[in-house]
Amino acid sequence: MEEGYSLELSFAPEIMAGKWPWLWDVVTGERYRLELPAGAALKLDLGPADSKLIVFDKKKEGKVFSAMPAAPAGEKQRLTRWSVEWQHIDGTNTKSEMEELRDLKEIPAYVSFSGIIIYRKTINLESGKFLDLGKVYGVSELSVNGVSQGAQWYGKRIFNLEKGENRLEITVTATMGNYLKTLTKNPVGQYWTNEKRKDQPIQSMGMAGPVTICSRPEAGQ
């Protein structure tokens, strides 16, 4: 569930006869035409817990699918020095600075954190780039200059950034498992996380990264 994987699919001729393959995005509802010659295999590079919906349709005109790169090529710049806001489910709200992103289970002060984590950073770009969030544990939502780029809990988290100022805000939800282990007077929480056969190991949480940016091909290239 935490690692990506690759697939190579072949389709029976009777499925493709008189039809064209389309990729349907189940999140946005968009449909994209796949350029797949008869007899050719379809190669998919999928992210963690990712899946794709392929439909064969008689319609043949439409926007051609262009996948985000599985691993953007070119020299990568690692983003460090993040401002972080911690909105705990117990109602407390604190802020801190993180020089390097880390899995919360590796940080004693936050190993049992549960709630909303907001990572903020502003960068200025001389040209359009790819942004790769790296390893993220939990549901995340990226906003750029106040505009949401969508929430995501699966797949590779790679996005386009435009030239100029980019105010990044990445919101990650940390679930309750690690926190429940600390509630020793809560019998329900202890039953599901600590007792006997239901003893749950400490789970990875938050944005471990590394978050990187790298060049993307310009239009026409």
Feature names for model-found ranges:
Residues 1-116, 124-126, 147-152, 173, ...:
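Carbohydrate-binding surfaces of carbohydrate-active enzymes
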Residues 2, 135-137, 163:
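A generic beta-sheet turn/junction motif
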Residues 44, 159-161, 169-171:
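Ligand-binding pocket scaffold of soluble enzyme catalytic domains
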Residues 51, 164-182:
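Short, well-structured beta-strand segments enriched in hydrophobic/aromatic residues
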Residues 123-145, 152, 168-172:
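Aromatic-lined ligand-binding clefts that engage carbohydrates, nucleic acids, or primary amines
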Residues 155, 161-164:
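Glycine-centered tight-turn motifs at strand-turn-strand junctions
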Residues 178-221:
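Exposed low-complexity, polar/acidic, P/S/T/G-rich flexible segments that act as propeptides
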